[in-house]
Amino acid sequence: MRLLAFLSLLALVLQETGTASLPRKERKRREEQMPREGDSFEVLPLRNDVLNPDNYGEVIDLSNYEELTDYGDQLPEVKVTSLAPATSISPAKSTTAPGTPSSNPTMTRPTTAGLLLSSQPNHGLPTCLVCVCLGSSVYCDDIDLEDIPPLPRRTAYLYARFNRISRIRAEDFKGLTKLKRIDLSNNLISSIDNDAFRLLHALQDLILPENQLEALPVLPSGIEFLDVRLNRLQSSGIQPAAFRAMEKLQFLYLSDNLLDSIPGPLPLSLRSVHLQNNLIETMQRDVFCDPEEHKHTRRQLEDIRLDGNPINLSLFPSAYFCLPRLPIGRFT
Ligand SMILES: *[C@@H]1O[C@H](CO)[C@@H](O)[C@H](O)[C@H]1NC(C)=O
């Protein structure tokens, strides 16, 4: 009898400790995953939930993400030691701070951006001191930039979100043939020289939402992901057949602009075209489907958004036969 009582007490105690320790373990596990203060995680592109298509997360340079977690602890040290030789450092090279093993990318905090940028115009600008350069990625978010800074030749990923850049010049990306992604979300860009992106043959993702663009420049044909949401794009600002040669284009996000027509012809590679909240009133019957070819030629294009436009989609019943799904929008 006493043994039985002891056993049930033991069971109770075990149950208690078991449940009590569970949340603690869970909490600890979460804490370990959380960035610590000073880790500079705010520069990472991983929180861009709003504009993520299915694969946007997959193409993020995860190797760099790991590097960043590795070097978090060294941040304060590097910051202090690497600021001194600012004037002599060429921005085209990856700089290595004294005391940091040479294989490490330089980590600096972008806190001195305003100072350095205003005192050192144009060449000689130590981009990797005001921005964070990690491998082939350059992070320049939210440091009051007014221009694209000179970039290291090997730059493949550029993030310069939340700045005050108003213009992109033809020479800004000249010779940066390794660039795969340019993210200039949330700037004041109202003009882009026509040649600014044209020769960037490696460019896959061009991300320009929340700017003031009325027109698009010539785009390189390798682009897979084009995001120009929340600008002032007009149909006259998009060249006729601007997207036709872009045979890798999968995501075309042009919502919340001033377009009054659907820009066509659209490449067959498209999976997603967002045109909601524009001024589209009508459409060409062949903008999606080729009336000559009675086939389901657009199996990929599953996501067409035309809601928030004055168009009555019921008026174009013959425009959708090749699509796997009807567009989203007003049908009555
Ligand atoms: C939209 O078009 C359909 C088909 O012609 C028509 O029946 C409907 O009344 C139209 N709706 C509006 C709001 O104009």
UniProtKB/Swiss-Prot annotation:
Tissue: Expressed in cartilage and synovial membranes (at protein level). Expressed in the retina, iris, ligament, skin and fetal liver (at protein level). Expressed in the retinal pigment epithelium (at protein level). Expressed in synovial fibroblasts and subchondral bone osteoblasts.
Bridged cysteine pairs (disulfide): C289-C322
SMART domains according to UniProt: LRR_TYP
Positions of the record's site feature: Cleavage: A20, S21, E32, Q33, T87, S88, G114, L115
Domain LRRNT intervals: 116-153
Chain segments carrying region Disordered: 21-41, 86-106
Annotated signal peptide: 1-19
Modifications the protein undergoes after translation, according to the UniProt entry: O-glycosylated.
Molecular function as annotated in GO: extracellular matrix structural constituent
UniProt GO BP: angiogenesis; articular cartilage development; bone development; collagen fibril organization; negative regulation of angiogenesis
Keyword presence, Signal: yes
Glycosylated residues, chain numbering: N312
InterPro entries (alphabetical): Leu-rich_rpt, Leu-rich_rpt_typical-subtyp, LRR_dom_sf, Mimecan/Epiphycan/Opticin
Swiss-Prot/TrEMBL LRR repeat ranges: 154-175, 178-199, 202-223, 248-269, 270-290, 300-320
Protein localization: Secreted, Extracellular space, Extracellular matrix
PROSITE patterns in alphabetical order: LRR
Sorted UniProt keywords: Disulfide bond, Extracellular matrix, Glycoprotein, Leucine-rich repeat, Repeat, Secreted, Signal, Sulfation
GO cellular component, one term: extracellular region
Keyword Repeat: yes
Modified residues (Sulfotyrosine): Y65, Y71, Y139
Compositionally biased region (Basic and acidic residues): 29-39
Function comment: Inhibits angiogenesis in the vitreous humor of the eye, and therefore represses neovascularization. Binds collagen fibrils. May be involved in collagen fiber organization via regulation of other members of the small leucine-rich repeat proteoglycan superfamily.
Similarity annotation: Belongs to the small leucine-rich proteoglycan (SLRP) family. SLRP class III subfamily.
Subunit and interaction comment: Homodimer.
Protein name, per record: Opticin
Lineage of producing organism: Eukaryota, Metazoa, Chordata, Craniata, Vertebrata
